[in-house]
Curated annotation (Swiss-Prot):
Short name of any one Pfam family annotated for the protein: Beta-prop_KIB1-4
Domain of life, per lineage: Eukaryota
Xref: InterPro entries: KIB1-4_b-propeller, SCF_F-box_domain
Domain F-box: 9-61
Name used for this protein in its record: Putative F-box protein At5g60060
């Protein structure tokens, strides 16, 4: 046997062109800062050779300031496009899974956000590490999410009927073509293409259509659902196709789209009901119904058993996790619960709820399951 085969691999001696090839091989969906940090953590040579700047970042396709809904005039202010990512952290010697939502503020520096919203978590749990060694954790991107925030440049007042933010934003990309599609004031669907677009355009201006959720599907398409459950899909050229008719009777109060493993699409319909107790005091309860998309039949079919899948319903994005570790197994829906005076800001929120799909019941938990992250 050749003695050289017994020597450990000298990763630091890898030719620079090979290292650049490895970096370029990060596909568009997974190429974010965390994956670059994982590569850079191998050795000092790799850290020096791989910059933190990410040329595949979709935000780079658009200007720093986006036009406001109502006008291309800068006097109305601007939107800034923000990105955050949900990650699943797994340690080889620890069976528990941790979910964490991060926003990169400067290259390599992350801010921890509430899992169900975009609130910054200022006070982390005592057992949450101040630093995460990427050589000790397996990191998987669960969901990438975007939102737009209003930035006033000192101009005039903005009419109150215009929304100053949007948590329902996707970026479509195909080759050199990119576009932002967002749900804004009144549930309308607006888009802005990269390049020379200086004003938002409306995709569907029907007076009786109110869109409630939008979801990126396989990079260059997006799925949109309205308040009645009618669902359509757009491609990067804004060609639209019907996916499913609406729910019988229109369904509940709020629709959420979730993509599961294998490209399966779920519709989570949220009901908020008022019940009367013996004390004549009303109490609101939350109920969810879950539907699976039947594309060939163009309809939603109700699902009674989620198996080992848990669904997470957030303000800006929803996602699924298969067989999560911790105190609760699959078959549950976790969501933000605003019924009891709102949610805590700046700390681990104590207003989160969980719904058992099997038992059709909900409750609020004061301590998050172990796999939630901070």
């Amino acid at each position: 046997m050749d003695s050289s085969s017994l020597l450990p691999s000298q990763w630091s001696d890898l030719p620079l062109d090979i290292l650049e090839l490895i970096s370029d091989r990060l596909d568009h969906d997974s190429s974010d800062t965390i994956h670059l940090l994982c590569l850079r953590s191998v050795c000092a040579t790799w850290r020096l050779s791989l910059p933190l700047s990410n040329k595949n970042n979709r935000l780079s396709k658009f200007p720093k300031y986006l036009p406001f809904w109502s006008s291309s005039s800068s006097s109305s202010g601007f939107f800034t496009l923000k990105q955050s990512n949900v990650y699943k952290l797994e340690a080889p010697l620890n069976p528990r899974t941790c979910l964490v939502k991060l926003q990169e503020t400067t290259p390599g520096i992350m801010r921890v956000l509430d899992l169900f919203s975009n609130d910054r978590i200022c006070f982390l749990p005592e057992n949450f590490p101040s630093k995460i060694d990427l050589q000790e954790f397996h990191v998987r991107l669960v969901r990438r999410t975007y939102r737009m925030e209003y930035a006033n440049n000192g101009g005039g007042a903005v009419p109150c009927f215009w929304s100053l933010h949007s948590d329902k934003v996707v970026i479509l990309s195909s080759g050199e073509d990119s576009a932002i599609i967002a749900i804004h004031s009144g549930g309308k669907l607006g888009f802005l293409k990269s390049g020379n677009d200086e004003k938002w355009k409306i995709l569907d201006n029907s007076w009786n259509v109110i869109y409630e959720d939008i979801m990126l599907y396989k990079d260059n398409r997006c799925i949109v659902v309205d308040d009645k459950g009618k669902t359509v899909i757009y491609d990067v050229d804004f060609k639209v196709s019907d996916l499913a008719e609406g729910l019988v009777g229109g369904g509940g109060h709020k629709k959420h789209l979730v993509e599961c493993s294998g490209g399966e699409v779920f519709l989570v319909d949220k009901y908020v009901k008022t019940v009367w107790c013996k004390s004549d005091i009303s109490k609101s309860v939350v109920e969810f119904r879950v539907y699976n998309l039947k594309r060939e039949e163009k309809r939603w079919e109700e699902v009674r058993d989620l198996g080992d899948v848990a669904l997470f319903i957030g303000d800006d994005c929803s996602f699924s996790v298969q067989n999560p570790a911790g105190d609760l197994a699959g078959g549950f829906i976790f969501y933000s619960d605003y019924r009891n005076g709102g949610r805590s800001r700046g700390i681990c929120s104590d207003g989160d709820g969980v719904f058992n799909v099997d038992m059709q019941g909900d409750f609020v938990f004061s301590i998050k399951p172990n796999y939630f992250g901070p």
